[in-house]
Amino acid sequence: LLVSGVNPFLAFAVGIILGFSLGIVNGILVAKVKLQPFIATLGTMSIYRGVAYIITGGWPVLDIPENFRKALDGDIFGVIPSSVVLLFVVGIIIWIILKYTRFGNYIYALGSNEEATKLSGVNVDFNKMMAYAICGVGAALAGMVLLARLGTGEPTAGQGYELNAIAAAAVGGTSLMGGKGTML
């Protein structure tokens, strides 16, 4: 969209909506179809990469507008990278959601004991789908920051990052059994 002359803000919004929608697809596969989360997300990742190859013909997308690049990969006051500010803002929003909202409590409850959460009257499937949708938005944001940083839309960008993310979460102390953890 950016290369075809679409307004960068509209392209950004479409990217976020697409990330949300593809996250919902993952959520449906896990919550409704009852696929194992690792299998569902690994499978859809392969499908989404295949679609990226088809759309781009396997070639990088060049000529990313400079204003888009500066917005997501520029510096604020010439010192602080805007991507760091974006990460900080998103981190605060997620922290507030997890700590101070009913949805955040439901996410912890789902990770701790899904059956007890369901018996407590929580709509487990909906909350799972929303969690995956939020992850999809996060992936879309990360993809746009990477696009701005590289200055090109590489259909192979990010390959191998998924294992780095799992390792970073585990090394950072996140319980792989769920139900525990904080933003810090």
Predicted features and spans:
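Small-residue faces within membrane-embedded alpha-helices
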Residues: 15, 19, 23, 27, ...
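Short coil/turn motifs that cap or connect alpha-helices
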Residues: 25, 113, 123-124
